Amino acid sequence: RSLRVGVIGAGMAGILAVIKLREAGITDIVCFEKADRVGGTWRENTYPGIGCDVPSHVYSYSFAPNPDFTRMFSPGHEIQAYLERVAVDHGVVPHLRLGDEVVSAIYDRGVWHLETARGHRADFDVVIAASGVLHHPRMPEIDGVDEFEGAMFHSARWDQDVPIDGRRVGVIGTGSTAVQITGALADRVEHFSLFQRTPQWIMPMDNKLFSDDQRATFRSEPHRLRELRDFLESAFAENFADAVVDAKSVRLEQIE
């Protein structure tokens, strides 16, 4: 009997899991996705300014380079389109069960028993959890928030029907999402307020465009794209190592 594998979630990790299982010769795979399409984080989040803070050609599968990314740091809709295309090109789609959220997973005598919100039941030898953590919005507990009469929503549930231009807008928090929203809205609104508990240290993003000629070169000479990816990965790894310093070091004192 072939190995039966259930994958929960069809975001970047879930898509990759199905692809690698197929490469290993496993074909009895079901990938459960609660939404109506793949994409995970990039499907769920549609707020103004959404983008990746990792270089486009690093934030992609090594076996599926994308010569058509338009910027060094991709906007969210380009990553979503990329993931949808990879799912088609690499045979993931036939294994998808969209709109079917897993609500129960019980392990008994060597078998996983899964049940979905639609009442479907299935048994698996192996279950891979790829549901992620960025699709459960957490609203802050603020006294009096229920009395606020204006539009209010979490960034992960952006209400596209609410007009923003020329309005008074407040954003709570200064994490990555808030920084992106601030940059996208500051010049569009009448008044913008950013409420933060702890100030961030922020530097400009050098988000240059890839020209038509560059993208054409990436398509016709794939090794050029691999070279760029390798360079970016190496540079980011080195920069990350440089950024992590001992709390008692002289260098940290210099930075501060």
Regions found by a protein language model. Give the residues of each.
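Feature captures the FAD/FMN-dependent oxidoreductase FAD-binding
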Residues: 71-135
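Rossmann-like dinucleotide-binding core of oxidoreductases
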Residues: 2, 6-8, 12, 16-23, ...
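Short, flexible, glycine/charge-rich loop motifs used to bind or transfer phosphoryl groups or to couple energy/partner
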Residues: 49, 93, 104-105, 117-119, ...
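A broad, structure-centric signal for solvent-exposed, well-ordered loop/edge residues
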Residues: 49, 54, 59, 68, ...
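Tryptophan-centric aromatic hotspots in well-structured domains and transmembrane helices
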Residues: 12, 42-44, 69, 101-115, ...
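General N-terminal targeting signals
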Residues: 55, 59, 64, 69, ...
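Beta1-alpha1 glycine-rich phosphate/pyrophosphate-binding loop at the start
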Residues: 3-96, 196-197
